[in-house]
Amino acid sequence: MESLSPKVFDAAVAVTTEILKFTSPADVILSNYFKSNRDLGSHERPVVADVAFSVIRNKTYLEKTSGSEDALMLCLATLNKVFGLSLKSLKTKVAARWHKDIQRLGDERAGELSISDRYSLPDWLWQKLDKQYGTDGASSLAQSLLRKAPFDLRVNLVRSSRDKVLAELAAEGIEATPTLLSPHGIRLKNNFGLQKHRLFLQGHIEVQDEGSQILAQLVDAKRGQMVVDFCAGAGGKTLALGAMMSNSGRLYAFDVSAKRLERLKPRLKRSGLSNVHPQLIGSETDPRIHRLTGKIDRVLIDAPCSGLGTLRRNPDMKWRQKEED
C-alpha cells in the first residue's frame, strides 16, 4: 500500500460511506466519485477502489471483528485485517485525527463468528450454497469470493496481436501475462489507468474476463458466417466474435434494452469492426428475428439472470439483492 496516504484514506472512507447505502452499484458510485475528484492521481485511484471494495467483500467479518458498522472503522479494519498493515503502520498512513480509532482495532472482540459472517455472506446465500455444494464446496467457493477478481484484457485481433500488446506493456513497465486458457487474453497485475492509455483508446484492447472470452471462443464463429448474439448488452462478447470472424460476414447484436445497446456504440467505434449490426428488439418473437430463420450459422445466448455469478467482481450485489430476487 505504498500509495496509501491521509488523502487517499479519506477518499476511500468517503466512497465506502456512499457504497454502504446500497442505493446504486458500487462501480457507478466509484466512477462518479472519481469524476468529481480529479485531484486523485492514477496511482491513488486504484488504492481507493481496493480499500472500498475490500470493505464490501468482507463487510460482516469486519463489522464483527471491529465492533462497528461505520465506514471509517471498516476501512481501518480492512487495512489491518485484510491487507495486513500493523496498527503502528496505519498511524503513519492516515490523519492524526483517526489515531484513537486505530487503537480501538486492538480491542479483543468476544464471541465466535458464524460461518456466514466469516465469509461475509447473507445467511440466505450461504444456506443456498451449502445446500447446493455441501459445506466444503460452499466454503471453498465463499473463500474465493473474498479475493479480488483478476483484471483481464482481450486483444482485438483486428487491430493488433497479443504478443505486440504484451511487448508494449512490458516496455512501459506494466506487469502483464498471457491468460492460461483464452488465446487472446492478457492478465494484468494492477490496473494502470487503462481508459486513458493509447492501446485502449485506439481499440487494441478491451476489458473482458477470461471466462467471457472462452465463452465467445466456444461459439467458434468463422470468417464469412452469419452470427447472432442474443442478449448482447454492452457487447463484450459481440466484439470478441466480430474479431474472430476477421471483420467479415454479418454479426447481429440483439437486445431488448436500448440503454445497454447504447453502451456498445463507443466500444464498437474503437474496435474498428464493420461487421457488427446492433438491433433493438421487442422480444424473442420480433419480426427481425424471424426474417433470419434458416440463415444463421451460429447463435450465442448469454441470458440475463440474478447476476450472482459476478459476485467476485461486483461484491455489493450480495448486499443489494434479496433472496426473492
Q: What is the role of each PLM region?
A:
Residues 1-195, 245, 295:
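Class I Rossmann-like S-adenosyl-L-methionine
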Residues 163-325:
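Rossmann-like S-adenosyl-L-methionine
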